[in-house]
Amino acid sequence: MSAVVSLDIGSSALAAVEINHSRDRVSLANAAIEALPEGLVVDGEVTQPEALAVHIQQLWRKAGLKGKRVRLGVANQRVFVRNVEMASIEDAEHRAAAVQFEAAEHIPIPPDSAIVDYQVTETFEDPSSGLRDRVVMVAAHREMVDALVSAVRRAGLTPESIDLEAFALLRSLLPPVPMIDAGSMDQPAQAICHVGASMTNVVIAVNRQCQFTRLFGFGGRQLTQAVVERTSMPVEEAEQVKRAIGLVGGIPNGWDENNTNAIRHALALGARPLVQEIGRSLDYYRSQAFARPIERVILSGGTSLCAGLDQYLAQALGAPVELANPVMQLDDANIDPQIAAHSAVAVGLALDGGDL
């Protein structure tokens, strides 16, 4: 049995998950979060590696995390994801070379400044050109990855792998595909909306294979700020009422109807851009020739703790919305709901490692 530690570095918090792998089970050994001050990570990019390293060390010490090798995820505006079609190539080395060539055509990063990875999502027969692959291509600015790695190494840890956060979300929030259905793209699509403090990641998959991913700059901080601007509450209090009162529900104990309605009105106004951008993402996916009907939307991320956000999105989007269960595939997964809400990426990283 070997311990694996995965670390999700967000704009407002660190989330670490340590799991145990044995022959027939995967169990949760430890999970913890550590709040971050503003400015260390901005829109998913590490801007102050030295200061961030101190908080990583604090998280390891407070939580009693034992592993020194970590798996990391990336998601920011300097990571580019493209869906391309190319001739199917069986040899892995030749395929990788072909992907590098395609990256030069599709990714707006100079080749010597980019780290490129890919995932084949479907192989199909084209009547005119034979076997072809649908490929999700990922490219990241090398200096952005270097800043992330630097912070982790300064904390005395060793990066084991770096993966796209979208892929990690698919592993933690969607059930494994039965062997009989592996490779089939005839199933309905599942959408994940991972709403963090400052960024939202929309991922759409069929049979756990990524077909679409989009990142945009909106998160829980904007909802909190909407309450601050319309009620003059301090930020800390606005953050609390955002979670406790939320967008939908009855009148909480200790609150009157007028104040509750004022807060919900502020949150509804603040949430409009979130609804619009998620809706645009879903509509764009639906417009693609390969799109499948979207069966449900799974809501994850720290902002999912905002009471009633799932119901609000379901009504606004006209689609079923479910709250995520990031630890559904782990045995003995007794975890605080506050920690669980922040752990979807970290759990997915722990379930498998990337190689960006």
Go through each PLM region and give its residues.
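Glycine-rich phosphate-binding loops at beta-strand->alpha-helix junctions
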Residues: G270, R292-E322
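Active-site neighborhood for divalent-cation/phosphate handling
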Residues: V74-I180, R296, P326-D332, V345
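Adenine-nucleotide phosphate-binding core of ATP-dependent small-molecule kinases
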Residues: E229, A238-I294
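Glycine-rich phosphate-binding loop plus the immediately following alpha-helix
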Residues: V41-G44, V145-R171, Q209-I251
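Non-catalytic, solvent-exposed interaction/assembly segments
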Residues: M1-E102, H106, D146, G156-T158
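Phosphate/pyrophosphate-binding loops at sites that engage ATP/ADP/AMP, CoA/4′-phosphopantetheine
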Residues: I56-R69, A155, M233, G279-E295
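Glycine-rich phosphate-binding/hydrolytic loop that grips phosphoryl groups
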Residues: A168-R171, S304, E322-L356
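Gly/Thr-rich phosphate-binding beta-strand-loop-beta motif of the actin/hexokinase/Hsp70
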Residues: M1-A35, K68-N76, P176-F212, G219-Q222, ...
